[in-house]
């Protein structure tokens, strides 16, 4: 959340496209001392000629390590012989085991040329990666490697960005340097770094390439003058630490990636409800009024959020004593909990440099970043002059745990249920060089003035405590440099190679890259892209420290590869524009399916600027089919809570009704991803990997394996040209079969409160019999089963249930459904008591039998009142 403050400080230098000195004369390396066995290969790499020293000093001696880790994964690591060059710390990215794979059984084959050294990775004699396109460069502050690609490749990934799902292959640059990117502009570096790409090749399969490197980087995708396609890495440091992985289809490739960066965290049942937030709620009374208005409008609100407005002068771990006093905050949270609702607030990393508890305790424990002369490093953010936690400090977790357990104490503080962390790229409003953050804060009115104080709510809020009603109704540290932490003598502020950072210099609007962290002695230059993910890990641990037995929900803005192990992600400060509505689909799909961060969603209706009734109504429907569903907007703009407009309210009620009835399907699919890496939200080509027409689709998607979502894409439209692959589908609302033939079908007369949904043939979907106002109430509803037979007449599905919140489950329900030859087979593990299955609906039917309650030529529903307690068979035809 940056907002209008961007206008107050121009960028320190325009964005510069990665500088391109002539590197073609660089000699590359020669391989020698090659040692090879069935599981691995090692070699020495020696500079093959006179150093070119284009953007630093060429390293004379390197090492090569190749590991056949599994049949589907190959590890190729090129690093300095002395192992002094920085490598991503294992505490951030735990390394996978080297495995027990072998070259004989591996689907991937490694081949190399000795001089100049280059390597290829093949799958069934098909070249997937070929570094012979240019000589390898490994310098003190610059690494370069180029691989050939096939003509017109289908590439995906390389996030975070707001470009199309399928990446451009001409004159395209992806830059990795996390920044506070207000408005999430296209063709620029945004909040996160995910240096992995997927290359989908239809029938021959899908493979991915993950470069474990956290340094600033440009990735170029382009063609040579003679038309040859390539992809090129240009990094400011680190090593080449590649993981190649493959699958017969993109879903399998995504599963393989999860084995490298880690499986995503399972979320609590309630987190899939509707969330409401706004930057600019003036006091606790307005927050309470929003909660009341949702109830009054009959729109289920699961979780209420508060932005930095609750803080005393924007200081973390504080409450505005006049607008958000502790007593009232505890009453608000108590009301929410009494009504089976939840509460979340924001915590930023930057701590106000002032006489306050969080700063004083951090100063005493010496856990803030320091300059090289040992003084406190200071920036400027919302509270004014700030210090930044050093996530590498050995005592940082104790400090963070203590602040959380005190401020968010269930008995004496604000008893939050989840956490929102923001500004953790890290953001710094003070432009580079930030030599006087005090003056900058003063000149830019940081912290901003709060709104006038109110003593009570201006309107009655039935059900809230008496004091919520109108007055008429009631009243320098030494750093030790070790191995793998970075070469000495580098220019950490202005490296010779300039990546295309939209903010200009590396330190502009963020932490100074010359800072050296406590503990191991890592430089911010190398670890900048890890700051947000390290805050995420520490924050998740702090949340578990105060509530050890439950799953913590943490939503972050900044991410690095593997962040899904700890957190979910919202897509940042978007605009209330149709193009942002559309691009949120591609963004969400990339995070959920390719980056293994499945708890993801955009600010519904848009964050910045004034939304419109039509846009918000459409977005209320679309947002319901992401995993994370939150309405949020910016101070100074019109209110956009779903109850503000009648059509938006109706759209939200209809979409939430469907979402909540599907919540166990969502929960089951999410659980599966947390256990296996199999994606829940998926691009269309994930399910139809041999249909080339699907490879570029990013305005439709699958909500799990069973539901095709085809939103209306633009203003003023009441129709959508939806692509239906060669398969059978069923209209969600009517059950009418739709036979796809690999072509578009125009869906017409789509009301503003409606979103087209189709069930994929071959699916069995468990749904609740009706929706509810809270997820707690929802869990008491009975089940229904929808059977949508595929072209072969069969269908399958599953249901997973647990207590919905605990980290460790004492009992679960894990049921598999199969339909074949007119019989429904139910089997599985039945430890947990579940609601009855009151009915089974079979789609695609003509006249039904005597047990059919309803027959209309498209479906029949059979009353069952079945208890899910043992294996069962039900004859349906």
UniProtKB/Swiss-Prot annotation:
Its main location: secreted. InterPro entries: Gal_mutarotase_sf_dom (IPR011013), Glyco_hydro_31_AS (IPR030458), Glyco_hydro_31_C (IPR048395), Glyco_hydro_31_N_dom (IPR025887), Glyco_hydro_31_TIM (IPR000322), Glyco_hydro_b (IPR013780), Glycoside_hydrolase_SF (IPR017853). Residues 432-476 are annotated as: Disordered. Its EC number is 3.2.1.20, 3.2.1.21. It catalyses: Hydrolysis of terminal, non-reducing (1->4)-linked alpha-D-glucose residues with release of alpha-D-glucose; Hydrolysis of terminal, non-reducing beta-D-glucosyl residues with release of beta-D-glucose. The active site is at residues 422, 425, 573. Keywords: Carbohydrate metabolism, Cell wall biogenesis/degradation, Glycoprotein, Glycosidase, Hydrolase, Polysaccharide degradation, Secreted, Signal. Residues 1-14 form the signal peptide. One of its GO terms (biological process) is polysaccharide catabolic process. Residues 447-463 have a biased composition (Pro residues). One of its GO terms (cellular component) is extracellular region. It is an enzyme of class 3 (hydrolase). Glycans are attached at residues 171, 293, 373, 508, 574, 610, 744. It is found in: Secreted. GO terms for molecular function: alpha-1,4-glucosidase activity; beta-glucosidase activity; carbohydrate binding. Disulfide bonds: none annotated. Glucosidase involved in the degradation of cellulosic biomass. Has both alpha- and beta-glucosidase activity. PANTHER family: ALPHA-GLUCOSIDASE (PTHR22762), ALPHA_BETA-GLUCOSIDASE AGDC-RELATED (PTHR22762:SF67). Belongs to the glycosyl hydrolase 31 family. This is Probable alpha/beta-glucosidase agdC.
């Amino acid at each position: 959340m940056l907002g209008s403050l961007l206008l107050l400080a121009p960028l320190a230098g325009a964005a510069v496209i990665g500088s391109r000195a002539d590197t073609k004369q660089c000699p590359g390396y020669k391989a020698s001392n090659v040692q090879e066995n069935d599981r691995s290969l090692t070699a020495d790499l020696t500079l093959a000629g006179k150093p070119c020293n284009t953007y630093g000093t060429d390293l004379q001696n390197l090492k090569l390590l190749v590991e056949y880790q599994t049949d589907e994964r190959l590890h190729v690591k090129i690093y300095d012989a002395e192992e002094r060059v920085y490598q991503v710390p294992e505490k951030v990215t735990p390394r996978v085991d080297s495995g027990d794979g072998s070259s004989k059984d591996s689907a991937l084959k490694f081949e190399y040329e000795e001089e100049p050294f280059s390597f290829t990775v093949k799958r069934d004699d098909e070249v997937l990666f070929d570094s012979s396109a240019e000589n390898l460069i490994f310098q003190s502050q610059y690494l370069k490697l180029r691989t050939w690609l096939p003509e017109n490749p289908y590439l995906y990934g390389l996030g975070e960005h707001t470009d199309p799902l399928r990446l451009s292959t001409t004159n395209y640059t992806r830059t990795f340097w996390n920044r506070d990117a207000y408005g999430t502009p296209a063709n620029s570096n945004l909040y996160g770094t995910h240096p992995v790409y997927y290359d989908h090749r239809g029938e021959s399969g899908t493979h991915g390439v993950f470069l474990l490197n956290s340094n600033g980087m440009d990735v170029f995708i382009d063609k040579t003058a003679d038309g040859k396609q390539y992809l090129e890495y240009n990094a400011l440091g680190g090593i080449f630490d590649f993981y190649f992985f493959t699958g017969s289809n993109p879903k399998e490739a995504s599963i393989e990636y999860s084995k490298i960066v880690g499986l995503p965290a399972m979320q609590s049942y309630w987190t899939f409800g509707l969330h409401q937030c706004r930057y600019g709620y003036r006091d606790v009374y307005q927050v309470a009024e929003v909660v009341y208005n949702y109830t009054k409008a009959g729109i289920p609100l699961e979780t209420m959020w508060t932005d930095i407005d609750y803080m005393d002068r924007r200081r973390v771990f504080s409450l505005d004593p006049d607008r958000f006093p502790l007593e009232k905050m505890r009453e608000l949270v108590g009301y929410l909990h009494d009504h089976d609702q939840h509460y979340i607030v924001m915590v930023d990393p930057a701590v106000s440099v002032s006489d306050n508890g969080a700063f004083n305790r951090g100063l005493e424990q010496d856990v803030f970043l320091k300059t090289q002369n040992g003084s406190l490093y200071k920036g400027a953010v919302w509270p004014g002059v700030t210090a930044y936690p050093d996530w590498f400090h050995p005592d940082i977790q104790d400090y963070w745990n203590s602040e959380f357990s005190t401020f968010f104490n269930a008995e004496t503080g604000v008893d939050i249920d989840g956490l929102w962390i923001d500004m953790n790229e890290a953001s710094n409003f003070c432009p580079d060089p930030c030599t006087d953050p005090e003056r900058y804060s003063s000149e830019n009115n940081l912290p901003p003035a709060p709104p006038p104080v109110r003593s009570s709510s201006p309107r009655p809020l039935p059900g809230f405590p008496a004091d919520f009603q109108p007055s008429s109704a009631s009243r320098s540290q030494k750093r030790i440099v070790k191995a793998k932490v970075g070469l000495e003598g580098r220019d950490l502020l202005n490296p010779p190679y300039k990546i295309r950072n939209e903010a200009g210099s590396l330190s502009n609007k963020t932490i100074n890259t010359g800072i050296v962290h406590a503990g191991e002695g890592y430089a911010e230059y190398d670890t900048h892209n890890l700051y947000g993910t390290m805050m995420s890990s520490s924050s998740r641990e702090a949340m578990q420290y105060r509530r050890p037995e439950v799953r913590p929900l943490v939503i972050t803005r900044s991410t690095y590869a593997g962040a899904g192990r700890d957190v979910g992600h919202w897509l940042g400060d978007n605009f209330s524009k149709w193009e942002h509505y559309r691009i949120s689909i591609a963004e969400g799909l990339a995070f959920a399916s390719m980056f293994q961060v499945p708890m993801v969603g955009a600010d519904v209706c848009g964050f910045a600027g004034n939304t419109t009734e039509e846009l918000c109504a459409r977005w209320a429907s679309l947002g319901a089919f992401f995993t994370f569903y939150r309405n949020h907007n910016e101070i100074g703009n019109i209110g956009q809570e779903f109850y503000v407009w009648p059509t938006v309210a109706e759209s939200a009620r209809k979409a939430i009704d469907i979402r909540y009835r599907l919540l166990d399907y969502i929960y089951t699919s999410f659980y599966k991803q947390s256990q296996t890496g199999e994606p829940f939200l998926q691009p269309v080509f994930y399910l139809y990997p041999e249909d080339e027409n699907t490879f570029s689709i990013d305005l439709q998607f699958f909500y799990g394996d069973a539901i095709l979502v085809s939103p209306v894409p633009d203003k003023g439209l009441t129709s959508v040209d939806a692509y239906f692959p060669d398969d059978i589908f069923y209209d969600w609302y009517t059950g009418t079969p739709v036979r796809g033939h690999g072509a578009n079908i125009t869906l017409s007369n789509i009301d503003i409160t409606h979103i087209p949904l189709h069930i994929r043939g071959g699916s069995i979907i468990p749904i609740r019999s009706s929706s509810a106002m809270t997820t707690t109430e929802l869990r008491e509803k009975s089940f229904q089963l929808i059977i949508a037979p595929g072209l072969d007449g069969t269908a399958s599905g599953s249901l997973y249930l647990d207590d919905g919140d605990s980290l460790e489950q004492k009992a679960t329900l894990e049921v598999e459904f199969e339909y074949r030859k007119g019989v429904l087979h139910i089997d599985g593990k039945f430890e947990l008591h579940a609601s009855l299955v009151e009915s089974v609906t079979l789609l695609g039917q003509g006249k039904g039998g005597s047990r059919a309650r309803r027959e209309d030529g498209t479906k029949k529903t059979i009353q069952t009142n079945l208890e899910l307690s043992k294996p069962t068979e039900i004859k349906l035809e």
